[in-house]
């Protein structure tokens, strides 16, 4: 019988490098598609189930529009909104640094098409003593828009 004096760890290292590659590739796919938006703070917020948030409209600080995390022009967004049903649920995620005019423009598009079921994403403010890590981003129900 052959006696093993030492263990060959090269196959183990090969497997670990393959697993590391898979993890890094997977992590890069997960991080893509997230739009960095600094949402405003609110003292009250009502949490939603994510399946209720069918359509997501995002405005970044540099006035970029996104529909369901994909860039879109204002004209294309208007055409898209025109195709929606009047009872369509919409979530607005607007950066705190964006101008109020950006908010008014989006809500005006929704009002023209009589879409009134609108929620606004805000960050729940846990108080002045709370740190940044203790804040949660939750969509809060807004007052329906009026035409």
Curated annotation (Swiss-Prot):
Membrane disposition: Single-pass type II membrane protein
Biased composition (Polar residues): 131-147
A molecular function GO annotation: transmembrane transporter activity
Taxonomy, superkingdom: Bacteria
GO cellular component, one term: plasma membrane
InterPro entries: ExbD, TonB_ExbD_2
Transmembrane segment boundaries: 10-30
Annotated localization: Cell inner membrane
Keywords carried by this UniProt record: Cell inner membrane, Cell membrane, Membrane, Protein transport, Transmembrane, Transmembrane helix, Transport
Pfam family, one: ExbD
Cytoplasmic side: 1-9
Disordered: annotated segments: 125-147
Stated role: Involved in the TonB-dependent energy-dependent transport of various receptor-bound substrates.
Assembly description: The accessory proteins ExbB and ExbD seem to form a complex with TonB.
Family matches, as PANTHER family: BIOPOLYMER TRANSPORT PROTEIN EXBD, EXBD MEMBRANE COMPONENT OF PMF-DRIVEN MACROMOLECULE IMPORT SYSTEM
Similarity comment text for this entry: Belongs to the ExbD/TolR family.
UniProt-recorded name of the protein: Biopolymer transport protein ExbD
Record gene name: exbD
């Amino acid at each position: 019988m052959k006696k093993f004096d030492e263990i060959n760890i090269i196959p183990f290292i090969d497997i670990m490098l393959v697993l590391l590659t898979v993890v890094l590739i997977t992590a890069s796919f997960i991080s893509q598609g997230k739009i960095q938006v600094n949402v405003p703070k609110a003292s009250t917020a009502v949490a939603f189930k994510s399946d209720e948030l069918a359509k997501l409209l995002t405005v970044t600080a540099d006035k970029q529009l996104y529909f369901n995390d994909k860039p879109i022009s204002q004209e294309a967004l208007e055409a898209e909104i025109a195709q929606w049903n009047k009872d369509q649920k919409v979530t607005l995620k607007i950066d705190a640094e964006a101008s109020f005019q950006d908010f008014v423009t989006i809500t005006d598009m929704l009002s023209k098409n009589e879409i009134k079921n609108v929620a606004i994403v805000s960050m729940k403010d846990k108080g002045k003593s709370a740190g940044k890590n203790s804040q949660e981003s939750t969509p809060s129900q807004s007052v329906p828009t009026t035409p």
